[in-house]
């Protein structure tokens, strides 16, 4: 029987990529980023591989939410007024290690440029992701997923998107950044 080197290369490539495929399949929400980690290889995803629904990938950056507070979704308040109190970061993401995380508002976290108070801009990207979810700008994860990520980071020091994979604060910030336009 004639040799089929093309099939062997395909099978070999498949075996090498299987870890990536298994990782993506193990946490469905994390498989659906708007941009690949490199930000340019495969571009934006339009649909989830496990659903026929269109994936909404219109996430905005921390800078957008900082500069456009009038676009914040209902129930999220950038500043305190006579009618409502500004939404505190700790109300959504409790038990933070820094003063900013413990007492600051969502807007304070977006505005902060202090790496000691918001390492890797993790808090700013969490706030942006939270506002993106609440305003239906992204549909591939939920507030509950964001809260789990935060909980695991402060409890264990990392978030595990899949078995055997550990994302530390910088990794989570990079992932969340990849969901922003």
Residue ranges and their predicted role:
Residues 16, 31-181:
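Soluble extracellular-acting proteins and domains
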Residues 1-18:
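N-terminal secretory signal peptides and thylakoid transit peptides that target proteins
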